[in-house]
Amino acid sequence: MKKTLLAALLISTGPALAGTAGVNSGSSMTTGPSSSALSLQSATHNPAMTSLVVPDKERWRISYLPSFGANTELGDVNNFYDDLDELIDIVDDPTSTQDPASEVLNRFNTTLESLGESGYLKGSLSFGLPILPLVHNTNYHDSSIGISAGVLAQFGLQVLDSDLTFDDQNGTFSTATSLYLKSGLEKSITLSYSRPILDTPALDFARPGKLYGGMSARLISLELSKQVSPIQQLDGNDVSDIITDEYDSNLNETTNIAFSAGVVWDVGRYQVGFTFENINSPEFDYGPIGTDCANRTENTPSRSSCEAAARFIQQDGRIRARETHTMHARTRIDGLYHFTNKWSASGSIDLAAYDDIVGFENQWLHLATMYNFDNNILPALRVGLQSNLTGTQLSSLTVGMSLFKFATLDLEYGLNSTSIDGSSAPRRFGIALGVEERF
């Protein structure tokens, strides 16, 4: 093929990447959504943290430049893309292999079954706007207000497998196997408010502390699209065009509002937070697929994609023509403990599983530790572990550093591996950058 399937997919999903669960930006790639006043991103995870991310003697805190986060995740199928590329070549040109037809059928029917069960590619991307998040401590009842905005995205690619067959008379291979791509583009702006709501007395296990409460409203514009692309139409020269065209034609945009609330108990040496996200469970519709195929021009990729979708909808029931994504209400607890003035540890856990916008199940556990240094060049280092407790059940090691007291760089490296081009590679990998005021 002139263009490998992997490269074509990365190019073609560019317009789509521009979801929700999937990637934490800035230092929260390592620490997760924990209640740490050192990170401005904490105010975007728990609205009650809006009161804590600005020091007492300050009134404002901002993020200088856009924050960025991206990660990818691969299914547990070795040489996923190599096998798909080779199969597309054989279907397009049977003379590209010298193996007997029986061997090709035995090999690829086994491979297709494996691809259908475990083969997938998922990617997530987030961008925050310059200056935002912006948090202001007011003089009114020690309350704080915050505003944040950004672009979040996600795509998920899976294989809808079908048997490979051989026509002895024509000497050709054929299969209804198709690629199933779901993607979304979310643009949002969030307003948050928080204030102290209770002074807590000294207890046997805690010093006097303060309980903060917060709430937020997030206006969301979410574009969702899904498509089915038969691999027989992917000849390697127009993969990007086919996927991009179908993304546009199946696109549907929905606008809704998500409300969240949270509390943080601050006792100085440690903090405990509780977040209740998407209280109203907002809904967003995907564009329909596999409908009105007769109205599309015959012998075109659009017609083939529509008919392939209709087949898997009507005969197999593996996908649905019309689908609604619900951002289900979910809860999370987190904690932060300071061993010393420089060394701390944090953790957070989702209390229930939920689906991201491309249908993958998530329930994340984050553990991290951070050490602060007395220098301006490398003021902090952090190391973390995150694990999806359901769904794909993958785990990753995360590391990060703060640079020059305003920049953050964090990396994610999966602990599970697969094979790509004969070499071992992590099934998850991510990177996050941020530039914000740090105190």
Show which residues each predicted segment covers.
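Gram-negative bacterial Sec-dependent N-terminal signal peptides
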Residues: 1-18
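Subset of outer-membrane beta-barrel
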Residues: 19-439
